[in-house]
Structures are given as structure tokens and as C-alpha cells.
Amino acid sequence: MTKFIFVTGGVVSSLGKGIAAASIAAILESRGLNVTMLKLDPYINVDPGTMSPFQHGEVFVTDDGAETDLDLGHYERFIDSTMTRRNSFSTGQVYENVIAKERRGDYLGGTVQVIPHITDEIKRRIHEGAAGYDVAIVEIGGTVGDIESLPFLEAIRQMRSQLGRNNTLFAHLSYVPYIAAAGEIKTKPTQHTVKEMLSIGLQPDILICRMDRTMPADERRKIALFCNVEERAIVGSYDVDSIYECPEMLHDQGIDNIITEQLQLNVQQADLTAWKKIVHAIQNPKHTVKIAMVGKYVDLTESYKSLIEALKHAGIHTETDVQITFVDSESIEKNNGDVSMLKDMDAILVPGGFGSRGVEGKIAAVRYARENNVPYLGICLGMQIALIEYARDVAGLKGANSTEFDLKCAAPVVALIDEWQTADGSVETRDESADLGGTMRLGAQEVELKAGSLAAKIYGSEHIRERHRHRYEVNNNYVPTLEQAGLVIGGVSAGRERLVETIELPNHPWFFACQFHPEFTSNPRKGHPLFTAFVKAALNNKKA
């Protein structure tokens, strides 16, 4: 049967539960176990798809089209398992399903309550997501003590009672601050968060202590005594330069031995050779490139988490220190298109996004890259922006724009597609008045690349599969005009619509843009061919 590891957090949020959980998963996977991961989000939103990036950060898209928490991106980068919509659910989804059952009469007129109906639905979803795996690591979002988390914590308490200690393990992440004025490490916050857990029936088996320095032996003994946890199960999670150092850091403290003993897992020794190579490559680069990322969410870089990591992965596989400079597209717009800050950059990237704010600043950045032969990579909106700039400045389509920004523009080269065929053959429709949630082209889609194109050379294939998240498409009515002006359509969707998927410029050192999100499938072990090619282009531009 599947063994469960439940990861919770206390004291404050943003301690790195996702990284800790993913690191444990990576270690267990290296010991030969088939591991999956789940993220349980206590918010009432159905999913993060319509949440502001400033509040929630990046929305990570799975292969099957689920819009999920960015932690699922960490999961896929740390382990080989591919996440699906079963690996993530929220309070909103739980209540939505329970209420739907009540409306259908599934509860036979009974009073629907948090216990047992909500907790039963949570447990059902956990078991569904974990089915078929040796170990499932379940991260509970939020902080112990938050009212929103209580049904989830009660559900995992019940699972411990039902499955037993040898099939479940509680790992609790706590903050252990260092007070500089006193010159002391303080364990009281950890004592209080464990007390909070005990009050709801949860006893941590492992305490992972987030610290900015190594934990002294006496403090470890103190935490073990007051929190009723074995001393060897008090594990330090220290600040590191790269998150990819975390698996080795936790393994060196024996966390996997504690887990395998309690869960009675008879497995091989851990082999972290691959992780050691990754860390060595990060710490010993031979080259340096500077890449400008021009967007509107630059004040919260978590909005571009997978993209940042994908560039780092490309750095690993090209022995390059990729230095990212975030450029606010609104500031370019407000300064009459001043792009002087881009002159020292080796390459320019415009990522995805929504809304009209900062668009003209992004267009100015694309124009600079095209006219000055600077390597350019556009992703999702970044492709649409590149196409709008080309339509205006090269193809002569005055008033070219997207209907997302100007519904009555003279040349809608990017528009809302109202009907398309999904990967399973069904037809979906949408219009301008449709709800924002659930009206996007989502998940992995087949893409056909033109023989001899830059796209085909980068991927080494004419058939690829990449993940999407967008509502607006290139208007195919304008494609002939754009192609006559020299634009190359390097890739189109495999469906009957033949939607534009990639564009490139033949008379430019390296100019490529795609409608899909390749960053969602990059990982440190393999990287991604598109980002590797982009970093190589930046290196070539630097040498030139």
C-alpha cells in the first residue's frame, strides 16, 4: 500500500515547505521508490488561475491542463513523476464537489458537515492522487493555526488513525530565528507551533527547522525535549545559494533513514550523484551572460518562477552563470520608449502575461532586439507582442494590435479564437463575455514544426508537445501578409485550426517566439532545448 508523508508548516508562511517536500521526494526517488506529490491549498478559490500574480505568484500548468500552485513546478523539477490535476486541489474544489453531491441527493437528506463530509472528500482526493505509488508526499498549504487549514489537518489526523504510524509520517517545518541583538537562536516559536499541532491531534515525527545558520547541539536537544521529537529527527534546513543543494543537505542529516525506518521501507541506499553534478555546475560556471526579462510583474519575481528556473537549467547545461535583469515594461512605456537599459544585455526575453498594462514598453523592447540583432525569446504574450511589432513596423499594418488590448483596433493580428478542437477531439467555444476561469487553451498540445526552421533545429524534431495557457491567438487572416513581409511561421498546432505556435526571423542572428510555455517542462537534470539554445545565442552575441 502507499505510504504517506504529510508536510506542514508553522510560525510564518514562505518557509519553503515545497522545496523541503520536493527534496525529500528526490532523496526517496534516488533510493528506488516510486514517488508522487500532492499540494493541498486551503484557499476557497477553485484554482489559482484567476488570482493576481502579485498575491499568488506563478500559475503552474500541468500536462492535462490544470492551473495549479507554483509548488507543483518544484515537484516536477525535483522528481521524474509528471503532475496532473489529481496532484493539486483547494478548499474551493472540495466544497464545490461536496455541494454538488448534496444537490444530487447523494447524502440521502443527511446534514452535510465539515466532519465527516468535507474531511472524507479531502481523504478521497488524497488517496486518488496517491494511487499506484510507493510513497505520496502531501504538502498542506498555509500555516498550522490558520482557520482555513483545519479541515485538511483534521483529515490527515484521521488518516494517521486509520492507516497507522508505519504508513504515515508527519514532517513539520518551523522557523528558528536568530536574534542578532541578543546573539541567540530562539526555539520558542517552534515550541509554540508544535503545541498548536498537538492541540489538534498531530504529533510531528520530524521537525525541519528553517535557519540561517547551523543548529548548535544544545538547541537541538532543547527542541527535541520540549517538542517530544527524537533528537536525530530535528533536521536543519539552512539558507543555501541554490535550492538544488537541499536534497544533499537533508540527506546528510539522515532524514531519509528516519523516514524509511518509520514507514518500514526496505530500499537501496540513496544515490545523489546527479544532484551533486548539478550543484557543481551551478557553483563552477565558465561563462556569464546577462539576460533582460521585460515584464510587468517584476516586483514579484515569483510570478516568473518556472521561467527563472528554466534559464538556470540552461546555465547548468552550458556551464554559464545566467544573470537575469528584470526590466519593468511600464517604466519603458512611461519614459517614451526609452530602452537604454537594454544596451548592456546579451539577450532579451519577454514572458507571458495578461492585460494591456506595459504592452507598449514590451513592444519597444522587441523593436530594439529586432533592429539591433540582439537574441530575442518571446513566450506566450511575448510571441504576440513580437508579432504586433512586426506587423506595425515591417509589414506596414498600421493600427495592428490584439483585441485583448484594443477591441476595435484597425488590424487585429491577435484575437480571441471562439472555437477550437482540444487534444481529445472535443470542440470548445468561448467569447468575450465568458468567465475568466476555465476559458483558456490549457495543457499539453501537439505542435508541428516546419522542416528546416529554427524551431525544428532547436528541438531536433518536427513534432513536439508543449504546454499552453492563453486565450488569444494569432489571427490566421493576417498570416499571408506577415509571411510576405518576411516573418517565418515555424510551427502550427496539429489540430484542424492550424494555430500559429512559433515565429522566427530568418535574417536575424536568433529571434524566436512561441505561443506555448516551454518553461513548465524544464528541469535541472535535462534542461530544455529551447532555453539551452537561447543561452547559447546570448553567449554568441556576447562574443560578437
UniProtKB/Swiss-Prot annotation:
Any GO molecular function: ATP binding
Active-site residues (renumbered): 380, 517, 519
InterPro entries assigned: Class_I_gatase-like, CTP_synthase, CTP_synthase_N, GATASE, GATase1_CTP_Synthase, P-loop_NTPase
Reactions this protein catalyses: UTP + L-glutamine + ATP + H2O = CTP + L-glutamate + ADP + phosphate + 2 H(+); L-glutamine + H2O = L-glutamate + NH4(+); UTP + NH4(+) + ATP = CTP + ADP + phosphate + 2 H(+)
Superkingdom as given in the UniProt entry: Bacteria
Binding site for ATP: 14-19, 71
Regulation: Allosterically activated by GTP, when glutamine is the substrate; GTP has no effect on the reaction when ammonia is the substrate. The allosteric effector GTP functions by stabilizing the protein conformation that binds the tetrahedral intermediate(s) formed during glutamine hydrolysis. Inhibited by the product CTP, via allosteric rather than competitive inhibition.
Swiss-Prot/TrEMBL keywords: ATP-binding, Glutamine amidotransferase, Ligase, Magnesium, Metal-binding, Nucleotide-binding, Pyrimidine biosynthesis
Pathway: Pyrimidine metabolism; CTP biosynthesis via de novo pathway; CTP from UDP: step 2/2
GO cellular component: cytosol
Residues bound to UTP: 13, 186-191, 222
Keyword tRNA processing among record annotations: no
UniProt: L-glutamine binding residues: 353, 381-384, 404, 471
Function (record text): Catalyzes the ATP-dependent amination of UTP to CTP with either L-glutamine or ammonia as the source of nitrogen. Regulates intracellular CTP levels through interactions with the four ribonucleotide triphosphates.
Note: CTPSs have evolved a hybrid strategy for distinguishing between UTP and CTP. The overlapping regions of the product feedback inhibitory and substrate sites recognize a common feature in both compounds, the triphosphate moiety. To differentiate isosteric substrate and product pyrimidine rings, an additional pocket far from the expected kinase/ligase catalytic site, specifically recognizes the cytosine and ribose portions of the product inhibitor.
Family indicated by similarity: Belongs to the CTP synthase family.
Oligomeric form and interacting partners: Homotetramer.
Record protein name field: CTP synthase
Organism expressing this protein natively: Neisseria meningitidis serogroup C / serotype 2a (strain ATCC 700532 / DSM 15464 / FAM18)
Lineage: Bacteria, Pseudomonadati, Pseudomonadota, Betaproteobacteria, Neisseriales
The encoding gene: pyrG
